[in-house]
C-alpha cells in the first residue's frame, strides 16, 4: 500500500487565486511538456489511445463521465487550465482580475482563436456558453456555475462574471467542462446529435472528425490552433489520434505492447513493475484527485434509505486488504472520504474506521431491526480487475453477515440507472477528481445537485458546503469542508468511500512530450512521435 508521499501536495487555495490579478505570458505550448533535452520534436504521425470505456456524451453541458473528458480536452479549450503541479494558468482567457469583494471576475480573452468551423471565439461566445450551461434543463454544470448571477460582455475580448457572492472554487470549475467553449453555430445546427457528433465544435488542438460509438473516435490536427511550443513553433505535432474504447486493462496493455495502441492512462497494479522494466515503454505517475466508492440509493422506499445500512457497509470494509490484494494493489491509497491527499483540505488523521469492524456493522444492522442486510451491487462489465475488486468486497462484507449480490452491466448503463435514482442497492462507481475539493464533494452531497445520485439530503451538510464556497480564508474553508465530511461519511453517510487512486500514463518509448496530470487525462498538444 502506498503512503501519502506519492501524492502531490497542492499548495494554496482558489480563494487566493481568485483574489489576485492573473496574467502574464502564456506558457509555451499551454504549459505542456516539451520533448526531453536533446530530443527534437517532429511533426506528423498518428497514434491510438486506449480509453477504458466508451464515451457517454461529448457535450460539456451533459457529460458526466471521466472517459468523455479524455476526448474533450483534445477538442475543446476551456477558459483556464491547470499544470501538472496544480497551478491554474491562462488558456482561452489571457488574464483575469477579481474585485476586492470577490463578487466580480473580469476575463480578458485571447484574440487569436477561432472555432473549428471558422466562427469567432469572443466575449459573446463566452456569455452564450455560460448561460447555456446555467439555464438549460438537465445541464450537469449548474452547480459549478451556481454562484454566477449574470455574464456581461464589456467588449469583444472582455467578459465579466457577476457573482451572487464570492465563490472560491470558480476557477477550478472553469478548468473543466464548465469552462469549455463550444461553437454556438455548430451546437444550434446539430441539435440532439451534438451529444456524440459535435464535429468542428471546439477551439482545441484537435478536431473531432469521426465518432463511431463503441468502436472509435478520430481526432485530427487543428492547423490553426493558437498554442506554440517553448521555441515558438506551432502545436500540435501529431496529425491524428484514434481513440478506441478497451474496457479490460489487461487487453489494453497487450494492445500497447503489440503496437496497436501507443497511450494508456490506466493499469492494474500487478503490471506496474513489468511496465517500468520494459525498455520499449515509458511509465509516468503522479498523485491523483480521484476516489473510489460504492453509491447507495438512499431515496425513500429503497434499502439504503436507512443510512445506518450505509454506515454498516462502510464499517465492514477492510480497506487495507482492498488496496493490497485487489487490482489497485500498489497504485492506490486507503481513504474514508472524497477529499484526497492532493487537496489543500486533506486531513491525514481522518480515519473513522482504521480497521474493518464487522462486529460493529452487525450490531448496527441489528439495531435497524429488519433482519440481515442483503443488496445488489452493479459492477461495470468488461474489466476482470474491477470484478475482482467487487468480489473481494463481497467476501469482506460476508464477515459482517452482509450479503452482496453482484450484477454486471456496462458503465454507461449503470450511470444511466444511477442518475435516475433507480439502482436497487449500490453501484460500483468512482470519480476522477477535481483540483479543488469542492469539485470532489459538493455535487455528490448537497441536496438536489446534479451528481447526487444517492439522493442524499442533510441540511447541515448543505449549509456547511454553501459556507465553504463563500469563504475566502483557506484555513477556515478547510475546517468547513472537514466538518461536512465528518457528517456525510460517518454521522449520516451519503455513500461508502474506500480509497484514492494515482494518475498513471503509459506510452510507447518513442512518444515524447507528454506528462501525467493528477486528473489522469492525457494532454496531446505537445506529444510527438520520434521516427
Where are the language model's segments positioned?
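Alpha-helical secondary-structure segments
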Residues: 48, 122-129, 156-162, 204-205, ...
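Detector for C-terminal structural segments
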Residues: 32, 212-216, 292, 316-346, ...
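Structural transition elements
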Residues: 206, 333-367, 383-387
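C-terminal motif of bacterial Sec signal peptides marking the signal peptidase cleavage site
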Residues: 17-20
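Short, solvent-exposed loop/beta-turn-alpha elements that line the ligand-binding surface or hinge
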Residues: 38-41, 67-100, 177-203, 207-208, ...
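Ligand-site clamp/hinge motif
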Residues: 225-274, 289, 403
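Aromatic- and charge-enriched surface segment that lines or borders ligand/interaction sites
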Residues: 94-139, 154, 160-162, 303-305
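Surface-exposed binding/hinge segments that line
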Residues: 108, 143-186, 207-212
Amino acid at each position: 500500500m502506498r503512503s501519502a508521499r506519492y501524492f502531490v501536495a497542492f499548495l494554496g487555495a482558489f480563494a487566493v487565486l481568485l483574489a489576485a490579478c492573473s496574467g502574464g505570458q502564456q506558457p509555451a505550448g499551454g504549459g505542456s511538456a516539451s520533448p526531453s533535452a536533446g530530443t527534437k520534436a517532429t511533426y506528423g504521425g498518428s497514434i491510438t489511445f486506449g480509453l477504458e470505456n466508451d464515451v457517454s456524451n461529448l457535450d460539456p453541458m451533459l457529460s458526466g463521465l471521466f472517459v468523455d473528458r479524455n476526448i474533450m480536452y483534445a477538442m475543446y479549450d476551456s477558459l483556464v487550465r491547470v499544470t501538472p503541479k496544480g497551478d491554474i494558468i491562462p488558456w482561452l482567457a489571457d488574464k483575469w482580475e477579481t474585485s476586492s469583494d470577490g463578487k466580480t471576475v473580469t476575463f480578458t480573452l485571447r484574440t487569436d482563436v477561432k472555432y473549428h468551423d471558422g466562427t469567432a471565439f469572443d466575449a459573446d461566445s463566452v456569455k452564450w456558453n455560460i448561460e447555456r450551461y446555467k439555464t438549460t434543463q438537465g445541464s450537469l454544470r449548474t452547480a459549478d456555475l451556481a454562484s454566477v448571477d449574470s455574464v456581461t460582455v464589456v467588449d469583444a475580448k472582455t467578459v465579466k462574471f457577476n457573482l451572487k457572492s464570492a465563490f472560491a472554487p470558480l476557477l477550478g470549475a472553469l478548468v473543466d467542462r464548465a469552462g469549455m467553449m463550444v461553437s454556438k453555430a455548430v451546437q444550434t445546427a446539430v441539435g440532439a446529435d451534438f451529444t456524440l457528433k459535435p464535429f468542428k465544435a471546439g477551439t482545441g488542438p484537435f478536431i473531432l472528425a469521426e465518432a463511431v460509438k463503441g468502436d472509435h473516435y478520430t481526432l485530427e490536427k487543428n492547423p490553426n490552433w493558437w498554442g506554440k511550443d517553448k521555441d515558438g513553433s506551432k502545436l500540435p505535432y501529431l496529425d491524428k489520434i484514434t481513440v478506441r474504447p478497451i474496457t479490460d486493462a489487461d487487453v489494453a496493455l497487450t494492445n500497447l505492447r503489440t503496437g496497436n495502441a501507443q497511450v494508456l492512462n490506466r493499469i492494474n497494479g500487478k503490471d506496474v513493475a513489468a511496465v517500468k522494466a520494459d525498455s520499449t515503454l515509458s511509465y509516468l505517475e503522479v498523485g491523483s484527485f480521484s476516489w473510489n466508492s460504492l453509491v447507495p440509493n438512499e431515496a425513500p422506499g429503497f434499502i439504503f434509505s436507512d443510512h445506518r445500512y450505509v454506515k454498516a457497509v462502510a464499517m465492514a470494509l477492510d480497506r487495507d486488504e482492498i488496496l493490497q490484494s485487489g487490482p489497485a494493489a500498489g497504485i492506490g491509497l486507503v481513504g474514508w472520504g472524497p477529499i484526497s491527499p492532493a487537496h489543500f483540505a486533506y486531513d491525514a488523521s481522518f480515519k473513522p474506521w482504521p480497521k474493518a469492524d464487522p462486529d460493529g456493522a452487525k450490531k448496527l444492522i441489528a439495531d435497524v431491526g429488519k433482519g440481515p442486510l442483503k443488496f445488489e451491487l452493479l459492477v461495470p462489465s468488461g474489466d476482470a480487475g474491477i470484478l475482482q475488486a467487487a468480489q473481494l468486497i463481497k467476501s469482506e462484507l460476508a464477515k459482517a453477515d452482509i450479503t452482496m449480490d453482484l450484477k454486471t452491466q456496462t458503465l454507461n448503463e449503470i450511470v444511466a440507472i444511477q442518475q435516475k435514482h433507480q439502482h436497487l442497492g449500490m453501484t460500483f462507481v468512482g470519480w476522477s477528481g477535481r483540483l479543488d475539493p469542492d469539485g470532489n464533494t459538493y455535487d455528490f452531497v448537497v441536496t438536489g445537485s446534479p451528481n447526487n445520485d444517492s439522493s442524499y439530503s442533510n441540511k447541515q451538510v448543505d449549509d456547511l458546503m454553501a459556507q465553504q464556497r463563500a469563504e475566502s480564508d483557506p484555513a477556515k474553508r478547510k475546517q468547513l469542508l472537514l466538518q461536512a465530511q465528518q457528517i456525510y461519511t460517518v454521522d449520516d453517510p451519503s455513500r461508502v468511500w474506500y480509497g484514492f487512486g494515482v494518475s498513471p500514463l503509459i506510452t510507447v518509448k518513442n512518444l515524447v512530450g507528454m506528462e501525467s496530470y493528477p486528473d489522469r487525462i492525457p494532454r496531446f498538444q505537445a506529444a510527438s512521435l520520434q521516427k
